[in-house]
Amino acid sequence: MYKTGFLAGISLAVMAGAVTYFSGISMSGAADIDATKVYMTHCKTCHGENGHPTDLGTGLGAREFANAEWQAKTTDEQIIKQINNGTPEKMMPFKEKLTQDEIKALVSVVRGFGKK
């Protein structure tokens, strides 16, 4: 009985691994996301390379991520919500373009600008 249960467990683990591998799903989640690359690809056009808005971003009301007051009063959840939903006529929503792991990883980049 023990052998049968053990073999069934191994079989399930192998099948789960195969499904994960062939579906392209990462088992490590946010751990292997290059958040800086995601930021540079999707955010820097308006928010700038260093978290200081570009001229385009300033015209759209982009946040100054290095602003200590904004950093202190803004929660990670608010940042995630903003990235997901955007702001009409100012910032496009990214919930359809980025994974939730990528969006969560962007929080660390945004927070990093407050430490510089």
Predicted features along the sequence, with ranges:
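Short hydrophobic/aromatic-rich motifs at helix boundaries and adjacent loops
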Residues: 14, 50-53, 79
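N-terminal export/targeting leaders of redox proteins
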Residues: 1-31, 116
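Phosphate-binding glycine-rich loops and adjacent basic patches that engage nucleotide phosphates
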Residues: 2-6, 38-48, 65-73
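Electron-transfer interface patches adjacent to heme c in soluble/periplasmic c-type cytochromes
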Residues: 63-77, 94-103
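C-terminal capping alpha-helices of c-type cytochrome domains
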Residues: 89, 96-116
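Short Fe-S-cluster ligation motifs
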Residues: 72-90
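Periplasmic/extracellular electron-transfer cofactor-ligation site
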Residues: 32, 36-61, 85-90, 112-116
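Solvent-exposed, polar/charged alpha-helical surfaces in well-ordered, non-transmembrane soluble domains
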Residues: 36-37, 41-44, 77, 81, ...
